[in-house]
Structures are given as structure tokens and as C-alpha cells.
Amino acid sequence: MFHRHLCKLCSKTPSAATLASPLGKLQEERGEGVAKDLKKDKQHRQIFLQKFRERLDSDTTGKNTLAGFIDLPEGISPTMAAVGPLKRGEEPLPPWLKMKVAKGVSRLPRFNSIRKSMREKRLATVCEEAKCPNIGECWGGDEEEGTATATIMVMGSHCTRGCRFCSVLTSRTPPPLDPDEPQKVANAVAEMGVDYIVMTMVDRDDLNDGGAAHVVRCVNAIKEKNPLLLLEALVGDFHGDLKLVETVALSPLSVYAHNIECVERITPNVRDRRASYRQSLKVLEHVNSFTKGAMLTKSSIMLGLGEKEEEVRQTLRDLRTAGVSAVTLGQYLQPARTRLKVSRYAHPKEFQMWEEEAMAMGFLYCASGPLVRSSYRAGEYYIKSLVKQRGAAATKSNTTTTTTNTASLAAATVTDSATLQGE
């Protein structure tokens, strides 16, 4: 009987005696309110869906379609509603990808310090935006050795490209750049108290220089705060403009990283159409030639997107030919239901095989494993030593050159003096 009074939509009418009572009136008013809210909510949904369809229809790029947001079986219309949970893939997650979350990681001083610093300064990290499985390990770090690190993402949290493997938000008109971001990033890095940091960026095709000048300002601000800090920049292709690539390469970086992401054949289906396999290779090759090999270059490959064994091998060869010194290989994991599905889960032994082959090809460093990511902190131990070795070699070379030049100048002075005396 109570539901009969509560719901206005019920076919039976409450009795006159019930309506006359204060409780009955209250129940009747509540029933009307519920009915109005339901009707209003339904109207809002219809209006939202209609506007969403209109926006998709008006898009001229051909990329932002409703079908592009959902993985649909062949023959199924994107307007049909799917009932029940969507499966991530036919294969269950293998045991080597099932991580045990370390208890109390969120209570680690360094983890909390990094998270607090990022929140206060409203900075984005790829660790969170890309849902990296190693966030606890990287942010928690080693309290004694100071190896904690976070990959800071500059130029906002919206990317102008729509790669089908990435969970970072996409927008054709992202918010304008924050002019104070370089200083905010520098302060955040200084508060972390680490000696190695990774800085990445979203692609900003809406900017004439792709954000190259902003990246340089961030790098300079970080290095001014801590000149001894080793800084790795994981950057985009800057529309393939090699002059912009040079602008970033001239900044005081330690490592220039640009990810090729996957093998050439599947690149058009995996990456945004404005990014290409050959363009990425050209960027990496140009950094190496422009800096005469002084800059350490790094790239990354994902497995589980439909690649074949020989294609992975060829990609490693291409990277090495381009002069890349460090490479990482990891398992692609679907970050959301709207992203590409995993084609297969590569076994840890396969990753071990690729690491051995990469080192045999001449790479100075290779991190290869199911949960390895392009900025995985395990790589920084060895990369730090490589950077320091190159820095020491460059210093020694400069010292030798200076000594040689001084000796030559002294010899020339003696010769000139002898000539003058003879005259």
C-alpha cells in the first residue's frame, strides 16, 4: 500500500482519508517529485545524445565517429545498445601480468610527496593519465638511493591526436598553454629530490611550433633549479619539422626520447594519421646526426597489437640504423574499452629474447618485459651511467682540444717571435 501512495505513476488512487492526512500529502508530493525528476533526466539524456550525434556528423576529419569510440563486431550498428558487460578480450589475463599491489605504498613519504606536489601545482603526469601499472614502484622509489621518479606531462592533459592505444584525453581545441608551467614544473621537480626525471608532452598540433618553445622553456627552468639533474624528454614529432626538433635537441637535455610505438605495418591502425613510422625514424635519426651522436636517443615498442616476430626484429634494426642508443619493449594493455583490444600476451621469455637480440644489434641499453614502459625507472640506473660517461668523455675531449689549441697557439707565438727577431 505504501508504494501506491508514493508513486504517482501507479494506476490505483490513494484513498481520500489517506490524502487528508499530513503523511499522505507528503507522500503524494514526493511521488510527484520523483516522476518529474525521471522525466527531466530522460529529456536531458535525449538532448545530450542528439547534440553528441550532431557533433559527430559535423566532424570533417572522418576520425571522430561513434563507431570509433566503440569496438563493435562486424555488422552491428553503432546505434544499437549493448546489454551486459563488454569483454576485454577472449584470452584471460596471464599470471605474469597480474600484479600484487604493495601494501602501504600510498603511505610512503616519497609517494605522497610526489602526489601532493603534482596536485598542488595542478600538473599532469603520464603515470596517472596513461594508467601506468608501475606507478607505485616509480613514485615510491628507493628511499636510500633516491631513485623515485615521475613522468611529468607538460602542455596540459588534452592531446590533439587520437592514437587508438592511448588513454590520454583528446581535443582539437585544447586549453591554451600555461605561461607559468615551466616554473611550476621546475619547483615540483626540485621538491621531489631526485637526480633523474622524465618529462613528456601531449601533441599540440594546434600550435605553430607544436609546443617546441614551451618544452625548451620547461627544460631550461628545470636545469636552472638543479644543474646536476639528469633530464629525459619524451617528446612528439613536431609535425616532422626538423628545425623544431633541433630547437629541442639544443636544450640542456640528457636523453632525447621519441617513441616509434609499434611495427610499420600496423602503424596506420594504431597511431594517429598525423604520426607515421618513417617520420618517427627521421626525427630520431636527425637528433643523432645533428648532435653528432652526443645526445643519447631512446625509443619504445609495444607488443600485443598484431605484430609479427620478423616485423619486431626489423623495427629494432631500423631504430639502431637511425642511431638510437636505448630501447624499451613492453606489453600493450588495453587502458579502456574504447581503445584497441590486445591481440596477444607475449610471454616473458619472448621479452628476454628481444632484449638479447637488441643488445646483440649494438644498443647500449634495452629494458624488455611485460610491464616495462618507455619511462620505466629500471632503465634509469644504467642510462644515468651512460649519460655520465658521455659527459665525462665530452669534458675530456674539450680539455684535450683546449690543450692542443693552447700548445698550437704557443708554438705559433714562438715562431712569430723568431721571425720578428730574424727580421
Swiss-Prot record:
Keyword tags: 4Fe-4S, Iron, Iron-sulfur, Metal-binding, Mitochondrion, S-adenosyl-L-methionine, Transferase
Species this chain originates from: Trypanosoma cruzi (strain CL Brener)
Record note on cofactor: Binds 2 [4Fe-4S] clusters per subunit. One cluster is coordinated with 3 cysteines and an exchangeable S-adenosyl-L-methionine.
Name used for this protein in its record: Lipoyl synthase 1, mitochondrial
Pathway(s) the chain acts in: Protein modification; protein lipoylation via endogenous pathway; protein N(6)-(lipoyl)lysine from octanoyl-[acyl-carrier-protein]: step 2/2
Gene3D superfamilies in the record: Aldolase class I
Pfam families on file: LIAS_N (PF16881), Radical_SAM (PF04055)
Residues annotated for [4Fe-4S] cluster 1 binding in this entry: C127, C132, C138, S375
